Amino acid sequence: MAGRGVKRALAALAACAALGASAADEGWYLQVDNDVFYGTDRWYTSGARIARVKSRGDHQVEIGVLQEIYTPEAKRHNDIDRPNAARLLATVARHDRVPGDWRTLELDLGVTGPSALGRQAQEFVHRYVSAPHEDWSHQRPDRFDGQASWVRTRTLGQESSGSPHLDATYGAVLGNQVAFAHAGLELRFGTGGAARDMSSPALRFAATPPLSFAQDGSWSFFLALSTRAVAWNHLLDFAPDLPQSTPRLRHAVQRFLGGFAWSHRLAQVTFVLVHDTREFVGQRRDHGFGSLTVHVPF
């Protein structure tokens, strides 16, 4: 009887371990982008994504909601600037991952314009965080907003535990509002296996839950650079009945970023600071924002 009890206890522990390993690939995650980390209130000023990731055989499926808010520079007037704009998108993505290789295919459908609730979201936040008033009359009327994204992140060379490694990321976003191709390199170093598997949506330009293959507590730091070739960006367009002219698009934009990832069996976190070069001709200076992603497996 005692032997049977021990066997049952061991079987139960094994089942719990298997459940925990499966849950590490699943759960809710929240991504928050904001330029408050730089003390500014301009251009790409806020973004939020909440999504659920679920394992489906050899891949994960993700369903979520994404909102992005863009504004002119609120703390000073510029003769050339972008209009207020917001996007509200329903998102679905497929993640195919093996160690050293991560491919994501994402489809987003929604609206750009007043129905994206950019003004309401900004006013709600500004009740608690003091900021200059924004004039949302410059945004265009509601328009359909749809896009498809594909991105791949690969480890270059043979990765060995505990040593720095280099990842290459490349992909494209094709939509009726924005379209661009991008490519970048990321140097990552740290301890343990879990955090080394994690990347940042600021580098991949797509849904990027902070998932890891291992469950050991670990951390990593990373530095990255990326360039994107922009075909069009209609989020820069002013409403047609306004006297302001739409700023001229820059077709090449560079991105520099640095941050850290932390992984534990209870949660995974990534944080990154981003520096973008100018997106349009006449933009007063480069732009920066921070991006925080938190995943809770359950």
Regions found by a protein language model. Name each.
Residues 42-48, 84-88, 103, 140-148, ...:
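Residues that define the transmembrane beta-barrel architecture of outer-membrane proteins
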Residues 18-22:
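N-terminal signal peptide c-region/cleavage motif recognized by signal peptidases
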